[in-house]
């Protein structure tokens, strides 16, 4: 969506990948990034700055799960999820927000989850990290609104991605019974919401959490 609207898209991953091939845009920029490493983030910032590619729109969508019932959850299960989902969010945003402040324009869009809003059995670590993202985004919105920087959250529900492939067809039907729209969402549903928040049409929307979940969680 961003590429089709004329944005220069920058994608990151721990491993090697070709973003241009994935989205059909030869001009897309691919980079390796380890959210656990301040040095890795620093190097990416330097690379993008040298290419005059520092982003005005930052989409934080990295996330991992290590599901386990709380009574059986190991310390490392908690630490790893918080480190990636929350501390990684802090590090990346801290690094890339300063140019936005200088330019007096920016969009920070953080991808949370319905689990962070309503909780989910077996996901105390994941739900906590995604819920904290909401508080992070609201506080950032209050601090940086005067600099024309918006900070919002998109909270997807059950979406047809690799993270839901563990469900078989019968399980998907059962889960869908609790969704008013009776189906899983698509990646495009989420992308369109992100695109809207990045657009000029959303220039007066900040500190908000938008659920893309077919009505699973209403508040």
Predicted regions and their residues:
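Canonical Rossmann dinucleotide-binding motif of NAD(H)/NADP(H)-dependent dehydrogenases/reductases
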Residues: 1-10
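Short C-terminal tail/terminal secondary-structure segment
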Residues: 118, 195, 206-219
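Active-site helix of classical SDR
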Residues: 93, 129, 137
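Active-site loop-to-helix junction immediately N-terminal to the catalytic Tyr of the SDR YXXXK motif
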Residues: 73, 119-127, 139, 167
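Substrate-binding pocket helix/loop in short-chain dehydrogenase/reductase
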Residues: 69-70, 74-82, 164, 175
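Alpha-helical segment proximal to the catalytic Tyr-Lys
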Residues: 98, 142-146, 203
